[in-house]
Amino acid sequence: AEETSFVFSKFKPLEPNLILQGDALVTVAGVLQLTNVDKNGVPEPSSLGRATYSAPINIWDSATGLVASFATSFRFTIYAPNIATIADGLAFFLAPVASAPDSGGGFLGLFDSAVSGSTYQTVAVEFDTYENTVFTDPPYTHIGFDVNSISSIKTVKWSLANGEAAKVLITYNSAVKLLVASLVYPSSKTSFILADIVDLSSVLPEWVRVGFSAATGASGGKIETHDVFSWSFASKLAGXXTKDSSFLDGG
């Protein structure tokens, strides 16, 4: 498929178009809950969950040299009972079709080593709430681009609004290899943006899965919720000379 698009305005408890891994589930209220909470809604430690779209996405084509541009938007909240002890974060990712949950905690279910490795074939936009110094994390909550490594190639400070719904738009323009992520809190009108050049065709396989991964801390009460309320995605294979990036505004 040269073009793919889908919209989840909310999620269904038995959603056929979602692959749930680890602790991820859809609540009766239609919320994609990536990590565990107890019966009182309190997040639990050492939890890891992922959710991906059921169909693989064609991100580039070796026969034609075409590379996809894409736009995805989603709404999520992170809520920590104690803002002083939070971990670890949520990520939107593109990874090989056979990708399975990896190490939890600071690895966010996407990697298993602090060392970069081309075999991961993974690109992620992380919303990271914990400073893992071994991953060269900055000393604050941040948005980061992860390319074959949990150590981000670029980060920007992100002021987490505890329990507030954030709206995220991530776009990739294949003509100029530009990856852009923005996060807005509509209630407080604060926004954060990160952009960098990433050549997806040199990192990812031709077909990928797209979705979310999240994890809580293993010890010390470093816990938070990771809830996704809605998600849309559109991609289109395009040549380098294309002018059609109209869908990149995310609708």
Curated annotation (Swiss-Prot):
GO MF annotation: an example: calcium ion binding
Name assigned to this protein: Seed lectin alpha chain
Binding-site list for D-glucose: 88, 106, 217-218
Assembly behavior: Heterotetramer consisting of heterodimers of alpha and beta chains.
Keywords assigned by UniProt, alphabetized: Antimicrobial, Calcium, Fungicide, Lectin, Manganese, Metal-binding
The keyword Lyase appears for this protein: no
Role of this protein: Galactose-binding lectin. Exhibits hemagglutination activity in a calcium- and magnesium-dependent manner. Also binds to several carbohydrates including lactose, D-galactose and GalNAc in a calcium- and magnesium-dependent manner. Likely to have antifungal activity as it is able to inhibit the activity of the A.flavus alpha-amylase.
InterPro entries: ConA-like_dom_sf, L-lectin, Lectin_LegA_CS, Lectin_legB_Mn/Ca_BS, Legume_lectin_dom, Leguminous_Lectin
Binding site for Mn(2+): 126, 128, 137, 142
Family: Belongs to the leguminous lectin family.
Annotated binding of Ca(2+), by residue: 128, 130, 132, 137
